[in-house]
Amino acid sequence: MPETKSSVSTLEQPETKPKKVGFVSLGCPKNLVDSEVMMGLLATNGAEITARAEDADIIVVNTCSFIDTAKQESVDTILEMAGHKATGRAQKLIVAGCLVERYRNEIQKNIPEVDAVVGTGELEAILAASGIEPRKSEANSPFVILNSTSASQQLKSGIADRPEGAAREEAGRFARTDWDGAVADLPNYLYDENTPRVLATPKYMAYIKVAEGCDHPCSFCIIPQLRGKFRSRRFESVVAEAERLAKQGVKEITLIGQDTTCYGEDLGLKDGLAQLLERLAQIEELQWVRFLYAYPNKITKRLLQTIADNPKIPKYMDVPLQHSAANVLKRMKRGAHGDIFLKSIEEMRRVIPDLTLRTSFIVGFPGETEEDFNQLCEFVKAAQIDWLGVFSYSDEEGAKAFALDEKVPPREIERRRKKLMSLQKQISKKKRKALIGREFDVILEGPSEETDLLWEGRTAMHAPEIDGKVYINDFAEHENVEPGQVFRCEITEAHDYDLVARLL
């Protein structure tokens, strides 16, 4: 009789040696924080975390399923890690994250190498899934930092009872009743300052998730079903976590959430994000406190003024606009249009003269006509945005847009994506050239991946991992420099997305 697989499995007998657990974390920084929480839970209960899958007794793949390419990468990675059960020492393969919320039964049925699954709302179940007994933590701090930057880079590059509360019978954007294996409950897990984390980022920076879930009705998105309703962490909890991180040597904190500009609304806070930024900027040890993912109509005057007035808050905003044509935005259930966005951008730049603006657009959304796309191109020319990402529309079953007609052919979607990226490349090149001769603080990230003769870093204009780099070539071999140090530099060269600088 074949063995029946459950979403949480336990070992019959405990092992005397600590189990080595390897993690592969895919997707966005929000997913990375989930991985850090699961690693923290494992580490404080006796497991040893490794970045080398070939050395692991247990392998965990934390998946993304936001778009088709992310789903495919997740499946490919699961299959790759499954090979370690056949050829290496790995005894158990656990799949976690968004893919589990969407395809729980299918994963267990079609990938027999998978021993357990852990959804986004049940991170604490990673202990039972790994066969590790909970024990009282003896650590004074809930944070552990991986021993080396290279180890954290390897981690990110790919190597019971559900704690979700009472069942919710939601319709519309929260409906999960037709999902394969999805439980009736929406995820409602939210970590706090006492939750252990193993930081997978370099020791000088960290992400803090200030909220989870999303209430926006965007028709192309299934995040509300994957992550649940929007819910903010307590103000004091975020501050306590930031203070503890700063005492451990973290210099740059990035606040993240599906929509950080909604932070605190569910707690009754007005301008919650602005208040939080103001408070965190008072932490002496921190160099920068930035945030990502601002919803366009949630940006307040106080938030803009807070960014403008505080030197510790980078003059940088990531505001995903998704499109500029009113017709497309209406079908996306986003509202507004290009003229409104241009006025908003004008106001942002008036209050914050040196603002660096990042946004993202979706091309090929159902019903996007050639005229709509041309409007988007004209908007990009007019807005002169600093950093821009372009995504090809991905038809996601479960999203409202899945049922829309007037689908754009894949070849046409790709043509539009390339055209818009080509247009933005010229804008980016011009904006980078305008920086030559200007001086900036640069936080060092380490020797360049291209050559040991160069060091690479970021200015406040560069968010971690998503924007360009600053290359510095005048460090003497004998100089004792370390990642995380900040140097004043002058920009000497500009390329399409990257800069070259010299020390001052």
Swiss-Prot record:
Subcellular location per the Swiss-Prot or TrEMBL entry: Cytoplasm
Residue ranges of domain Radical SAM core in the record: 200-430
Binding site residues for [4Fe-4S] cluster 1: 28, 64, 98
Main location group: cytoplasm
Pfam families: Radical_SAM, TRAM_2, UPF0004
Catalytic activity: L-aspartate(89)-[ribosomal protein uS12]-hydrogen + (sulfur carrier)-SH + AH2 + 2 S-adenosyl-L-methionine = 3-methylsulfanyl-L-aspartate(89)-[ribosomal protein uS12]-hydrogen + (sulfur carrier)-H + 5'-deoxyadenosine + L-methionine + A + S-adenosyl-L-homocysteine + 2 H(+)
Binding site for [4Fe-4S] cluster 2: 214, 218, 221
Cofactor(s) it depends on: [4Fe-4S] cluster
Single GO MF annotation: 4 iron, 4 sulfur cluster binding
Superkingdom of origin: Bacteria
EC code(s) of this entry: 2.8.4.4
GO cellular component terms attached to this protein's record: cytosol
NCBIfam families registered for this protein in UniProt: 30S ribosomal protein S12 methylthiotransferase RimO, MiaB/RimO family radical SAM methylthiotransferase
Name the UniProt record assigns to this protein: Ribosomal protein uS12 methylthiotransferase RimO
